[in-house]
Structure formats: structure tokens, C-alpha cells
Amino acid sequence: MKITINREHCVDGLQKAGNVTPARAATVMLKTTWIRTDRAGKSITLMASNGYTEYLGTYPAEVEKDGFMGVYGKSLADLLRALPEGSVDMFTDRRGRNLVISQGSRLYKLPASNREWFQPLIPFPGTGTVGWSGEELLDIIDRVFFCILDDEDSPLGCLCIHPEENGGIDFCGLNGCRAALVRITNSALHGKLPGEGILIQKKYLADIRRLISPGEIEIGLTPRRFFIRNRGARDMVSVPLAQFAYPDYSVFFDRMKADTCSIVRVSRSEFSDALARSLIFNTRDENSVAISIGKDSLTIASSGKSTGSATETIAADCRSTVEHLVFVTRILAELLSHFGTGSLTMRIASGTGPCSFHTDTDENYAVIAMPESAPVTGL
């Protein structure tokens, strides 16, 4: 193999491949980035897999001699990122035991991986793909991710993508004390989803966030995998689907539509700013904020034995039979950070029951959170 690449063109793909291969993998096989050249296509293909997530990237290159080899992915990515901009030559030595990288007077060698370790990647489905926006997908993942349980052995450790009878698609995350739901309309994707929906584990969502660009993308589905590639097919990522039975999340969100719920409307930005200041007065053991609900205001208070106390009152429109709520300050502040500006609506089932949050500017996004059962003391 003998090629010349432009460092700026390929470093992104090498970094993505390196991000897939775990640095602490038990075997060198799972740390390998594989490089296949295509002289006719004037390109190289980068391939990496951690045994679950698979990445394939195609980048331009001047190919003098075709070849195929694997090297430790993180080392190659780190080296290319550390080199100055410009052309970089790569070739195998005579015995094929090393990949030689040179740029001007700089010369480096990386040992080659055993070719027998290579496992072919699963190809992108040839038919039935769906066009979408990478930016929208990443935004949805971000809005739901924090509500997904950190448990690989539970269905609650997954993002649920479920088609609804009205043509909508739900993206839901649950963790036992919080739930997030984004609902979109995409008729093409709706038609490709199985009736029971699909589940993607949280750890693979993290891979998607690292590897997908915000431009136009194509989605592919098989019974076992979820595929994403950009429209130019330069980068492709696929992750396995989980095979759990997901709970019926609709019962939680339907409960929050009941006429018996108390309703509070408040400025999201004012509420968030007050929580940020209250957080200053929290400690590791005293980490909650007390919210008192009046007719036209919310009083937000927190304290710590060693930090003092904070009390703020902000305007609100309240129709509530619930007078007091308690939340862990940091959790509530993080929750609100996923909403845009404008008026925030809270629907409250009871003082110790669930509360739902949504804004007037985004009716298709809602989060449910459970308050703390014990009141804040010392205020």
C-alpha cells in the first residue's frame, strides 16, 4: 500500500474511527482501524468496530499502490491530529509489518495488526432508506438522553422510537424518576418502523452523538441494526438494536393531562436563572430547592449549614391546589436547560406526585419529573 492524503481531509475520519475503538479494549483487534485503498476511486476507506458500533468512512487520497492493513486506531488519529496541515505519505514496509507515515523530514512507524482479525462490516441497506436531518436527530437525542437509565440490562437503558397511529413518531426515555418525550412527524420514517418500535441502548446513542454530523443524513433499518450515513455516503455508522419489551410510557404522559392537575406558568429563563443562583447555596448533603406556589408567584429557596441561604420570588400564573414542591436543584436546572425560551408550563399531579414540563413554543416536547418526598429543612 502506498498513498498520499491531505491531513485536513482525513483527520476527521481517523478521529471518528479512533473514537469507536475503545482504548481499554481487552484485545488489540478491537483497537484497530482498518484502511482499504481504492486506486480507481482515488479514495481510502476507514473501518472500525468495537464489536457493536461500526464506523465506515470514505475519504479522498492519491493511491499509488492498492492495499489493505490495520493499525492501532487511536495512535494513528492522534498522530495525524498533531501533524501540521498538508500532505502526508503512508506506505507499508517491505514485509508489510509496519505502516510508515512521513511528512517532510518527519518519519513514523506503526505496527500492523494481524489481517485475520478483520471482521467485515455490515453494509448499509440497499433499499428503503429515509432522508432526514442529522441536526434534528442529534437535538432529539440530547433532549431525551438525560432521562435514560444507565443500565445496559434494562429496557429503561434504551431510547424508544415508536410509531403512533396518528402518524407521529415518539422518541422516549425513562429512568424511573424522570421521563422525556419528543414527538415528530416523518411519514417516510414512520413507514419503515416496526409497529412495536425500536430500542437503541444509551451507550450507542453516545457513539452516534460523537460520530454523526449535523447535515443531511440517510437512515437505514434492519431487524437487528440502525444505520446512519451522510448524504454523500462519506461517513456511515451502525449500531445494534436492543431486544427488550419497553413499558407503556403513554400512561405517564396521559396522567399529566388530567383536569385534576394543578397548573403553573412561569418564564423559563427567570426560573432557570433563579435555580442557578440557588445552586450556589447547596452542599453535597443539602442539595434541594423548595418551591412555594402562590396565586401569582413562585418562591424559590435553598440553604446549607455552611453556605447560608437564598430566597427569590418570581412572577407566575398559578392555578394550583399544591402549595409546596421540593426538587434536587441540579436535576431540575438540567431539566429546564433542555427547553427553549418563553413560557414554561408545569402540570402537577400532587405535592409528591409527578410534574410535567413543556413550553408554549414546543408543544411536541415534554419532560416528567418526580419531586422529592421530604421537604427542605432549615429555610
Over which residues does each language-model region extend?
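Structural preference for solvent-exposed beta-strand-turn elements
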Residues: M1-L379
